[in-house]
Design a protein with these regions (language model features):
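N-terminal active-site segment of His-dependent metallophosphoesterases
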Residues: 1-67
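Extended active-site neighborhood of metal-dependent phosphoesterases/phosphodiesterases
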Residues: 2-7, 65-170, 263-268
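Binuclear metal-dependent phosphoesterase catalytic core
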Residues: 2-5, 9, 18, 115-126, ...
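Active-site environment of divalent metal-dependent phosphoester hydrolases
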Residues: 24-26, 56-59, 81-92, 140-143, ...
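Metal-dependent catalytic neighborhoods of phosphoester/phosphodiester hydrolases
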Residues: 28, 52-71, 88-106, 189, ...
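Soluble or luminal CAZymes and related metallo-dependent hydrolases
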Residues: 28-32, 60, 64, 110, ...
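His/acidic metal-ligating clusters that form di-metal
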Residues: 43-47, 131-133, 145-233
Length: 294
């Protein structure tokens, strides 16, 4: 477990998820910072998660990363990262992230190291009321999709979920889960809002270890948020669980003018079984989406 966050005096906690800056040039890092600034001013999140694919060749410099996250640092907001297919785990890069203030990345002993659970405390007591899972979803393409979660990762998630449940007197702790590569099940969800201007890259069906079924069984994760697809910002629902895309931040790599922005997830401790999500754009052509409640 990591340092714990806290709901505000009204019981609210807001998460901003952005993804895929995939910057290669300094002007793109500055552009990503400008778009992040827009989102932070607009949404005032308590926590920011950057959901993979920071730089195409996984060669991020401390200088460029500092440009990108300066708006977060200035506001003293806690933040973390998730590995994407373009940035498989490198200890030296994770160590660089940790040199910046308020970074909550950690390493779990696992086949792929960067998985973590960040608890969020209630406003008035030392009790976990919400949790944020960050998961490594693999970097290799196999036949019909990406490698996705491993069995060891799934076992870790189950154990962590059960630990939180035990601490909460046998009641599951409402949670969100972020990973870069979408689960295979996105093709089956009912799309509620958003644009989808490319094929939905996802976990290989052959390598699917049953992540979605495990999440249904645990009953704690209400929403999964993905990256990877730069021209998709949809939100959908399957079997009572929301699955949404973060869209893209910056013009790094391929992009369009409709999915530039980030996904917001809101929780309130006074309604502990509910989450609210919507997508927030940074360009005039990237239209905000209506809120979805589950």
């Amino acid at each position: 477990m990591l340092q714990k966050l806290k709901c505000n005096k009204n019981g609210d906690f807001t998460v901003l998820v952005v993804a895929d800056p995939q910057c290669e040039k300094e002007f793109q890092w500055k552009e990503a910072a400008d778009e992040l600034e827009i989102l932070l001013k607009k949404e005032e999140p308590d926590f920011v998660l950057i959901n993979g694919d920071m730089e195409t060749n996984n060669l991020i410099t401390k200088e460029n990363w500092g440009i990108f996250i300066q708006p977060i640092i200035e506001r003293k907001i806690f933040w973390s990262t998730v590995n994407g297919n373009h940035d498989p785990f490198k200890k030296e890069i994770n160590d660089m992230y940790l040199e910046f203030d308020k970074c909550l990345n950690t390493i779990i002993e696992n086949e792929r190291p960067l998985n973590y659970c960040i608890p969020v405390l209630g406003s008035k007591e030392e009790k976990t009321v919400f949790a944020i899972y960050g998961m490594d979803s693999g970097d290799a393409f196999i036949d019909d999709g990406w490698t996705g979660y491993t069995k060891k990762q799934l076992e870790w998630y189950r154990n962590c979920s059960e630990e939180l449940k035990t601490e909460n007197n046998g009641v599951s702790v409402t949670s969100m889960m972020c990973c870069h590569i979408p689960l295979q099940e996105v093709v089956s969800m009912e799309i509620l809002h958003g644009v989808c201007n490319e094929n939905m890259g996802r976990t290989s069906k052959a390598l699917n270890v049953g992540t979605f079924e495990a999440i249904k069984e645990q009953g704690d994760v209400k929403i999964l948020v993905f990256g990877h697809s730069h021209k998709i910002n949809v939100i959908g629902k399957l079997d009572g669980i929301l699955m949404g895309y973060a869209g893209k931040i910056s013009s790094g790599s391929y992009h369009d003018e409709f999915s530039r922005g980030g996904r917001i997830v809101k929780f309130n401790e006074n309604e502990p079984n509910k989450v609210v999500t919507y997508w927030s754009g940074v360009l005039p052509t990237s239209k905000d989406q209506p809120a979805v409640v589950i």
